[in-house]
């Protein structure tokens, strides 16, 4: 941000110095410039390189940004003919790198205008920032344009079915506003599912889950089958603690290294009658909060993970506002296994027992019956 302001002040000084009524200076005509939304690009570049937990370098970020600028220049009627400067292979912002990059982008923009193309500075900037973040793909890193268009850095796609409530069994009620519903299946397997970790207003998913578990116990439940397919987010704060006893759940990694380990809150552990055998179903449509919930259980061998690998969205982001209403969100932390040290962000949580969507519930029931 400070560099962007300094650049803006410098630009104003240049304009003031050239605004005279007399003849041109003997030094020649000032370099022609186009509107490339330079402040937007500067702030976005600085935020991305300074904050990215994956240590994106100035070189990789600006090369990706310049490649995107070339593509957009051609799309707007210009040419992609500009040399790539020698950027620094450093994970810190480089003033000279950005100056060289901005000069190259200016050449492309002027080329569009000279060719009579339909030049749009906004589209140019959107394409550049959107291309830049692809150099460090992560589900939390994204660019949101002033018009509200979301450009993701990661090409990972959400795949798989949503949770499928079995036809048989005794209903436990629902679904409620978080999609929480369940059944006690033959043999005492309590099937529970919800599609969002909701904490809003008077509704708390942890309290609602405890209530439905208590209802299942009253109906003779002997094991928990938690189906988190299609659960893409929310806040899983402390919910894993309900089934653990103070064990470490995940380790937070920042750009500068280990940022601490989270442990289950013993005060939130459910009473002994709730501590039944447990299986959790995941697939490529399980992400973020559902992964955090499953992570601590898997790391501590409290539950058997059944199904397919989860999406792999385990981290946190920092939102950075940009001029004009746009913003760039950068991944600043990722979560790894507190016990094993395994990295799950951008990789997904692998199942202990593989099963496709059609057979996952049956496979989980089979496993739980062996543990009752």
Region spans (language model):
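Short beta-strand/turn micro-motifs composed of small residues
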Residues: 228, 282, 307
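Flexible, low-complexity junctional segments that flank or bridge functional domains
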Residues: 4, 10, 17-251, 319, ...
């Amino acid at each position: 941000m400070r560099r962007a302001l300094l650049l803006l002040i410098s630009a104003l000084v240049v304009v003031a110095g050239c605004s005279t009524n007399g003849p041109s200076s003997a030094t020649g005509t000032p370099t022609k410039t186009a509107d490339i939304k330079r402040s937007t690009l500067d702030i976005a570049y600085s935020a991305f390189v300074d904050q990215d937990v994956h240590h994106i370098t100035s070189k990789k970020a600006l090369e990706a940004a310049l490649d995107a600028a070339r593509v957009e220049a051609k799309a707007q009627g210009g040419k992609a003919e500009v040399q790539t400067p020698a950027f620094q292979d450093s994970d810190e912002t480089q003033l000279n790198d950005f100056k060289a990059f901005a000069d190259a982008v200016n050449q492309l923009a002027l080329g569009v205008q000279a060719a009579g193309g339909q030049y749009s500075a906004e589209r140019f900037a959107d394409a550049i920032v959107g291309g830049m973040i692809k150099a460090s793909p992560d589900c939390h890193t994204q660019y949101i344009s002033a018009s509200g268009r979301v450009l993701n850095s990661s090409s990972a796609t959400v795949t798989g079915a949503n949770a499928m409530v079995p036809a048989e069994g005794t209903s436990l009620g629902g679904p409620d506003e978080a999609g929480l519903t369940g059944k006690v299946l033959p043999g005492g397997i309590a099937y529970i599912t919800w599609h969002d970790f909701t904490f809003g207003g008077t509704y708390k998913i942890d309290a609602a889950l405890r209530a439905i578990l208590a209802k299942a116990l009253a109906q003779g439940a002997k094991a928990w089958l938690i189906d988190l397919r299609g659960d893409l987010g929310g806040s899983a704060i402390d919910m894993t603690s309900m089934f653990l006893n103070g064990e470490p759940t995940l380790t937070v990694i920042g750009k500068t290294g280990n940022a601490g380990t989270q442990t289950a809150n013993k005060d939130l552990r459910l009473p002994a009658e709730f501590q039944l055998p447990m299986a959790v179903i995941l697939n490529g449509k399980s992400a973020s909060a559902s992964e955090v919930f499953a992570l601590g259980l898997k790391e501590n061998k409290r539950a058997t993970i059944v199904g397919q690998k989860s999406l792999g969205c385990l981290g946190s982001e920092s939102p950075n506002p940009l001029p004009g209403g746009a913003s760039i969100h950068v991944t600043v932390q990722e979560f790894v296994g507190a016990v094993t040290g395994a990295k799950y962000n951008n990789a997904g949580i692998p199942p202990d027992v593989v099963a496709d969507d059609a057979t996952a519930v049956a496979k989980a029931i089979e496993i739980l019956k062996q543990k009752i």
